[in-house]
Amino acid sequence: VRVAFDSRAKGDPRGIGRYVRCILEALRETAEPGSVITETQRPRRSDVFHSPWLDGAHLRCPCPSVITLHDLVNLKGRGEYLRTGVRFKLRYLAVQRADRVIVPTQVVANDAQQHLDIDSERITVIPEAADASMYPRGAEEIAAVRARYALPAEYLLWVGGMLHPERRKRVADLAQAPRRMPLVLVGPARPWAHELPDVTLTGQVSDDELAALYSGAHALVFPSDDEGFGLPSVEALACGTPVVACEAPALREVLGDRATFVEVGDMEGLLEAGARALRPAPPPPAWSWADAARATWRVYAAAIAQSHPVSTRRAPRLPRGAF
């Protein structure tokens, strides 16, 4: 099988970059003899094209296409979606035309059916996983990362991108809520995040540093009210750190009884539950990137077997509520 894979997001410090790096490595490790993966955004002379993000979606693709749809947060927030303009509307149309759509949770699958009118037969749920670098670190590594970022002995941790003040992530609400334990925010940040009160920002960190930060935290707090998967929560569990989250449907699907949940929007309750969290944390879900890669290879095979010529595919329509 000749796979064209759009890997442009590989260097992105956010979750999309982690997904691309991990699934690419696992796809190569699980490939059948003779299968070839070419990193390109031009799906020529290929049996199947995989765009692992919305930005790489092709409205007209010369070969069977697979798109990974991580969430539909922008589309569900109708006002935000309308402001994104024609470019994003066309990308959603490209998702509708794809031969197969990969999503990380059944929650996103349901959203894709409801908002994009995608047949359930074309959607495959393939969960994500913690990278192999995410494992409990020893006291020496934890002490080193604490010293490097001037962290206290005990702290609550939040991990994610702070490039834009996304309302659904509730980072500002979290920072402003009363708490009895210091809060550390990890991830790439723009100036607005540096104005948040009484928090420590580490900026972007290496994988080894991130694992040590997870391992040294009292708990990971996850205040989002909407997520597609919530990979930091699985990474934290892999490092032995308890997780406390708001009742976002996808987080509940992924974590089940492995986390403590509070009502959406209850930042004080979230922080208090984080301060009361106890080790040892439950293990993460028993799912690996190798499992995800094998499932993805099966999706490629299905896309190739059931693909229709571009000219015979159903004409796309704008998502519900687009205008």
Briefly describe each language-model feature range.
Residues V1-F323:
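Carbohydrate transferase catalytic cores enriched for Leloir-type hexosyltransferases
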